[in-house]
Amino acid sequence: RGIDRRSIAEISFAHHAVPTALPIHPDSPLYHQLLSDSADYSPDDLVKGLEGQQLGSDGLVFLVNSENSSKVAAAQRIVDQLSGAGVSISLERLSWTDYLAALERGDFDLYLAEVRLTADFDLTQLVGTRGGLNYGGWSDPSTDGLLSAFRAAGAELRSSAAASLCSHLIQNAPIVPICFKNGSVLTQWGRLSGLDPVRDNVFHGLENWVLDP
């Protein structure tokens, strides 16, 4: 509850992102707004939730790749927000090579990362036991069961399976979604036509673009 996702999407990513507390895009029919709202920014609730928690005398170490200025800005904003709620946390900016090495060693408390999800929003690689992107080593039978149920759910049960999985992830927080990035092409009004962007490639069909004088 200590992260203001809207300010990160609007300021750190210059409106090129959609804030959400769920690992599912808000435009998806699987998205549950009430669940996302339940994890929305609320510093007071974070303070209450941290009462009696032991976070270590040295505070938390938060890693970010120093080679991406937008991510550094977002990470700093997160640090400022958590610090404002009383969390002792420091930001460590690392080169991509050092950042990846630290993740592989598990030498971190928190880290900011970008992940390209598959179209079905399968999170097995992120939070499944022995998942290839599960750098935190999260291993939980309930999570694995919910992931399996989500993958196996037919059309009628898929929404409820997604809700159960997202509710579990909010309660346990092995990952904390921030936003989904948007791709964009900036051009003068009316100068460019024929754009045909697809997922992960705003320049799809570049050879068919028409630039008007």
For every predicted segment, state its role.
Residues 29-46, 102-106, 124-151, 180-213:
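Short, solvent-exposed loop/beta-turn-alpha elements that line the ligand-binding surface or hinge
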Residues 51-117:
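Ligand/substrate-recognition segments at binding pockets and active sites
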Residues 1-28, 166-174, 179:
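Periplasmic-binding protein-like
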Residues 5-8, 15-19, 28-31, 67-70, ...:
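Solvent-exposed loop/turn segments at secondary-structure junctions
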Residues 59, 72-77, 84, 124, ...:
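Small-molecule-sensing regulatory modules
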Residues 1-10, 141-159:
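Extended ligand-binding regions for polar small-molecule ligands
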